[in-house]
Curated annotation (Swiss-Prot):
<keyword id="KW-0479">Metal-binding</keyword>
<dbReference type="GO" id="GO:0042744">
    <property type="term" value="P:hydrogen peroxide catabolic process"/>
</dbReference>
<dbReference type="GO" id="GO:0070301">
    <property type="term" value="P:cellular response to hydrogen peroxide"/>
</dbReference>
<comment type="function">
    <text>Bifunctional enzyme with both catalase and broad-spectrum peroxidase activity. Also displays NADH oxidase, INH lyase and isonicotinoyl-NAD synthase activities.</text>
</comment>
<dbReference type="InterPro" id="IPR010255">
    <property type="entry name" value="Haem_peroxidase_sf"/>
</dbReference>
<dbReference type="GO" id="GO:0020037">
    <property type="term" value="F:heme binding"/>
</dbReference>
<dbReference type="InterPro" id="IPR019793">
    <property type="entry name" value="Peroxidases_heam-ligand_BS"/>
</dbReference>
<feature type="cross-link" description="Tryptophyl-tyrosyl-methioninium (Trp-Tyr) (with M-252)">
    <location>
        <begin position="105"/>
        <end position="226"/>
    </location>
</feature>
<keyword id="KW-0349">Heme</keyword>
<keyword id="KW-0575">Peroxidase</keyword>
<dbReference type="InterPro" id="IPR019794">
    <property type="entry name" value="Peroxidases_AS"/>
</dbReference>
<feature type="cross-link" description="Tryptophyl-tyrosyl-methioninium (Tyr-Met) (with W-105)">
    <location>
        <begin position="226"/>
        <end position="252"/>
    </location>
</feature>
<dbReference type="GO" id="GO:0006979">
    <property type="term" value="P:response to oxidative stress"/>
</dbReference>
<comment type="subunit">
    <text>Homotetramer.</text>
</comment>
<dbReference type="GO" id="GO:0004601">
    <property type="term" value="F:peroxidase activity"/>
</dbReference>
<comment type="similarity">
    <text>Belongs to the peroxidase family. Peroxidase/catalase subfamily.</text>
</comment>
<dbReference type="GO" id="GO:0046872">
    <property type="term" value="F:metal ion binding"/>
</dbReference>
Length: 726
């Protein structure tokens, strides 16, 4: 029978001939554009976490809901939960303290100070990949144990806050005094797609510590939070782990003392789990069958839980009192001699060979065992610098307690930004340098003050390009990941930002603005810098024939140099800023990808990014004053010329050299070079998504819309760190 007969017959019987195969016919299935073009520009990263994914709606106010919370009632419920052992996941020694501490630690421990991404501030442990990370085995059980409490308190407490608070309560209920707790972490409702977890395709692929210093990666192996507890690449060598430990904790902004305190404090309570071979453990939550309902790692070893639990494959209990705070970690570390052994699962660990059996069994009170340690625990004894700190903590338990309390607070709050974002009754009063503290406002300019300042700025002799450049340089350091940077504080005038190459032209305007501030005697330099941008944009729009008002919210303050951690602020120096046509290094990604990265850090959408780049170019705001991307003969006028000329087919573009970083736009008829451009310019004509937006702004009826959109995006960037306006 012919093919046509087959089709005819199936149609005759009421069956669609194209629906008879086994292909997945659901939305999103099949080969995607990224399968065909894996290097396609990730413009989609600018569309994350929209209201379309948020079930609470755009009017939901978490801070307002939190104010209704019975905070101490919640803590009381968490305390009770700690000792309410559940048969489906029995508690070690009748306490979930160690489990909840690990949950909080691993939620916060994804933070990287290099790019400010990761951390506990968004509740990302609920989603892939972190919910199925090899280092997060069994934390699905911790989150599920918390569900009745989350259900009870509803939206008055976010998952993100609850994870960290549960860790704090676990410590407190074990006899430890924490430094405090700041709430304010708002949940998101889908995975972060912008976090670069690394290029490795296989779990637990080893990375050299030197590589970590050059990339925004938080762990030494794909799928770990920090380092391999068995030593680098399962080496079993404590001393060789020191470099890896310093690299990973250093990437979180931790020094040696904080690192020692965190490792020891985190290993004072609880245990690891390796009752049997990890081959008995089933798929992670993302791969588990639907009937598992979001849980994973089901084990077929014995009962699979309690005494038979398998998590990391390591079977370590550090202290004699694993549910009560003590200094036993350091006492055992230095008191005994340690020999390498293997867990029942075959993982490398150490046992105190000369110790008596003093460690209680988690489920059988009649049993005892010898103290055990991870390979990386012994690093604190054998690395010379770590040893000095560890011996000091051994001899001064109070110093250890204080160091751990502060380091734990830093770990769990590092990605929350300034203290003004913290809410709740247990926020510490002390300002900490890593919070980028700011002084209290002493004066808020009146409307007349603002008018007078605008006149002074307009008459200062600074060009539109200079006014716009100085404001952008101040505000554009903001990072949406950890809420650092921004215009508030005027740290552009301080070290290290004042000396950054990218700011060389912008800071030339500072003496003029500082003089205006001095003469005003009231306004902050931070406000004046942003107001300079307002004046520049309004002048540029007026020159284009449009009378506009750029919104301005006063109230910024000026930070002092002693409130500015130079080393930590160095991390805000951009590798590239496509908005200013700046790129410092050519060995890191493509120029256009780095533009997307910068826009995502500034929480911009694709249209906002497009409008800002187009406007910055015609305003002549390139970092070095170059003409790259300045597709206009009327610089300083807020026109849509950038888009009109970029999309004009009269011009063809050719790279100036093999690097293909710079290009010339020549008239097709005369061959005359009309414009020059970078990849950050041409991407708006090359990438199909960005071109679609550029075509809107290049249209004959788009000038007013472009100016309106540019102003809205500009004001957004200027106010990104104005958490007091929320």
């Amino acid at each position: 029978m012919s093919t046509s007969d087959d089709i005819h017959n199936t149609t005759a019987t009421g069956k669609c001939p194209f629906h008879q195969g086994g292909h997945d016919q659901s939305a999103g299935a099949g080969t995607t554009t990224r399968d065909w073009w894996p290097n396609q520009l990730r413009v989609d990263l600018l569309n994350q976490h929209s209201n379309r994914s948020n079930p609470l709606g755009e009017d939901f106010d978490y801070r307002k809901e939190f104010s209704k919370l019975d905070y101490y009632g919640l803590k009381k419920d968490l305390k009770a939960l700690l000792t309410e052992s559940q048969p489906w996941w029995p508690a070690d020694w009748g306490s979930y303290a160690g489990l909840f501490i690990r949950m909080a630690w691993h939620g916060a421990g994804t933070y990287r100070s290099i790019d400010g991404r990761g951390g506990a501030g968004r509740g990302q442990q609920r989603f892939a990949p972190l919910n199925s990370w090899p280092d997060n085995v069994s934390l699905d059980k911790a989150r599920r144990l918390l569900w009745p409490i989350k259900q009870k308190y509803g939206q008055k407490i976010s998952w993100a806050d609850l994870f960290i608070l549960a860790g704090n309560v676990a410590l407190e209920n074990s006899g430890f005094r924490t430094f405090g707790f700041g709430a304010g972490r708002e949940d998101v409702w889908e995975p972060d797609l912008d976090v670069n977890w690394g290029d490795e395709k296989a779990w637990l692929t080893h990375r050299h510590p030197e590589a970590l210093a050059k990339a925004p990666l938080g762990a030494t192996e794909m799928g770990l939070i920090y380092v391999n507890p068995e030593g680098p690449d399962h080496s079993g060598e404590p001393l060789s782990a020191a470099a890896a430990i310093r690299a990973t904790f250093g990437n979180m902004g931790m020094n040696d003392e904080e690192t020692v305190a965190l490792i020891a404090g985190g290993h004072t309570l609880g245990k690891t789990h390796g009752a049997g071979p990890t081959s008995n453990v089933g798929p992670d939550p993302e791969a588990a069958p639907i009937e598992e309902q979001g849980l994973g790692w089901a084990s077929t070893y014995g009962s699979g839980v309690g005494a038979d639990a398998i998590t990391s494959g390591l079977e370590v209990v550090w202290t004699q009192t694993p549910t009560q705070w003590s200094n036993y970690f350091f006492e055992n570390l230095f008191k005994y001699e340690w020999v390498q052994t293997r867990s029942p699962a075959g993982a490398i660990q150490f046992e105190a060979v000369d110790a008596p059996e003093i460690i209680p069994d988690p489920f059988d009170p009649s049993k005892k065992r010898k103290p055990t340690m991870l390979v990386t625990d012994l690093t604190l004894r054998f690395d010379p610098e770590f040893e000095k700190i560890s011996r000091r903590f051994l001899n001064d338990p109070q110093a250890f307690n204080e160091a751990f309390a502060r380091a734990w607070f830093k770990l769990t709050h590092r990605d929350m930004g300034p203290k003004s974002r913290y809410i709740g009754p247990e926020v510490p009063k002390e300002d900490l340098i890593w919070q980028d503290p700011l002084p209290q406002p002493i004066y808020n300019p009146t409307e007349q003050d603002i008018i007078d300042l605008k006149f002074a700025i307009a008459d200062s002799g600074l060009s539109v390009s200079e006014l716009v450049s100085v404001a952008w340089a101040s505000a554009s350091t903001f990072r949406g990941g950890d809420k650092r940077g921004g215009a508030n504080g005027a740290r552009l005038a301080l070290m290290p930002q004042r000396d950054w190459d990218v700011n060389a032209a912008a800071v030339r305007a500072l003496p003029v603005l500082e003089k205006i501030q001095k003469e005003s005697g009231k306004a902050s330099l931070a406000d004046i810098i942003v107001l300079a941008g307002v004046v520049g944009v309004e002048k540029a729009a007026s020159a284009a024939g449009l009378s506009i008002h750029v919104p301005f919210a006063p109230g910024r303050v000026d930070a002092r140099q002693d409130q500015t951690d130079i080393e930590m602020f160095e991390l805000l120096e951009p590798i590239a800023d496509g908005f200013r046509n700046y790129r410092a290094r050519l060995d890191v990604s493509t120029t256009e990808s780095l533009l997307i990265d910068k826009a995502q850090q500034l929480t911009l959408t694709a249209p906002e990014m497009t409008a800002l780049v187009g406007g910055m170019r015609v305003l002549g705001a390139n970092f070095d004053g170059s003409k790259n991307g300045v597709f206009t003969d009327r610089v300083g006028v807020l026109s849509n010329d950038f888009f009109v000329n970029l999309l004009d087919m009269r011009y063809e573009w050719k790279a100036t050299d093999e690097s293909k970083e710079l290009f010339e736009g020549r008239d097709r008829e005369t061959g005359e070079v009309k414009f020059t451009a970078s990849r950050a310019d041409l991407v708006f004509g090359s990438n199909s998504v960005l071109r679609a937006v550029a075509e809107v702004y290049a249209s004959s009826d788009a000038h007013e819309k472009f100016v309106k959109d540019f102003v809205a995006a500009w004001v957004k960037v200027m106010n990104l760190d104005r958490f007091d306006l929320l």
